[in-house]
């Protein structure tokens, strides 16, 4: 599929206060659009795979080592030591600082990995969106932790019974992050996990090595391996990662791979959250290459 993806890019065009997202052929990274008789926009290709290395530079990590790291993460929850509000907010604040203080470094790493993706678009769509979500979670985590009242059923309601739901963390959440938004889809789920009081183990994409290495370095500098573990490894490591007995597993990627992930997770009865690729809506206008759209959209 990479061959067809390389021929296309997403362009965000703003005209008359309206934003159009157009999927269009890529030629020399630049395309001229005649949006009206008075408007000519030279748009730079901002999404693509021109610089993506489809061969991993990472070695595989033995399954026993992955399992040992998971055991360390799980031990805290086995001991019943659940993170409270103060600790959750501290973790979230660290993530906010990581993204905010290193936004330029993230942009440069993503640009280096992708080649054709404009750095400002990466900052907006991948980095700043992560920061916005982390700030939102930091502000709201206290209210999310509050117990919720429920009405007890008959006959307990006649006996003065009261019912409440107290939300508890799963324990250790596994996160499999794809290549297309390597910051948002790795740190974003980590924000979720931390806000809910979980620890996490993240498998980063081997296809964006500079960004993945930066994420790993920053996480290691700010968190202990009893809070979060970042894994960079080749294909077999990704396969072994899905075989680990997590308390919950988050996967973002293709439907075909998701079937394999689901199959492995089912062997350990691991609940899943899947965000899967699918249809990509396209706006076709009069000057669009319709035959190309029919083939690739």
Predicted regions, residues:
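Single conserved hydrophobic/aromatic residue that forms the stacking wall/gate
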Residues: 289-297
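N-terminal Rossmann-like NAD(P)+-binding subdomain of aldehyde/semialdehyde dehydrogenases
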Residues: 39, 43-162
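Adenylate-forming
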Residues: 88, 288-289
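Aldehyde/semialdehyde dehydrogenase
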Residues: 48, 78-97, 236-260, 297
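Short, positively charged and aromatic/hydrophobic N-terminal segments
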Residues: 14, 21-23, 30-36, 40-41
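Rossmann-like NAD(P) dinucleotide-binding subdomain of oxidoreductase/dehydrogenase enzymes
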Residues: 153-287
């Amino acid at each position: 599929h990479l061959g067809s993806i390389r021929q296309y890019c997403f362009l965000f065009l703003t005209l008359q206060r309206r934003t159009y997202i157009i999927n269009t052929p890529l030629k020399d990274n630049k395309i001229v659009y005649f949006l009206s008789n008075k408007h000519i926009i030279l748009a730079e290709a901002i999404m693509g795979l021109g610089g993506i290395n489809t061969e991993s530079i990472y070695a595989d990590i033995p399954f026993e080592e992955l399992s040992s790291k998971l055991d360390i993460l799980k031990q805290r929850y086995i001991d019943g030591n659940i993170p409270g509000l103060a600790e959750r907010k501290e973790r979230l604040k660290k993530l906010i600082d990581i993204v905010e203080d290193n936004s330029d470094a993230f942009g440069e790493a993503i640009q280096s990995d992708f080649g054709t993706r404009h750095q400002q678009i990466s900052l907006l769509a991948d980095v700043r969106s992560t920061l916005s979500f982390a700030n939102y979670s930091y502000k709201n985590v206290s209210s999310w932790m509050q117990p919720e009242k429920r009405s007890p059923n008959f006959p307990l309601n006649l006996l003065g019974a009261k019912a409440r739901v107290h939300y508890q963390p799963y324990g250790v959440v596994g996160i499999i992050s794809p290549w297309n938004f390597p910051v948002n889809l790795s740190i974003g789920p980590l924000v979720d996990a931390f806000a809910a009081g979980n620890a996490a183990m993240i498998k980063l994409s081997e296809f964006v090595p500079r960004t993945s290495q930066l994420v790993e370095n920053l996480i290691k500098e700010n968190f202990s391996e009893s809070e979060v573990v970042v894994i960079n490894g080749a294909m077999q490591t990704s396969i072994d990662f899905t075989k680990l007995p997590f308390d919950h597993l988050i996967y973002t990627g293709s439907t075909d791979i998701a079937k394999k992930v689901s199959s492995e997770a089912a062997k350990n009865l691991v609940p899943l959250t899947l965000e899967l690729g699918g249809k990509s809506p396209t706006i076709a206008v009069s000057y669009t290459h319709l035959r190309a759209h029919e083939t690739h959209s």
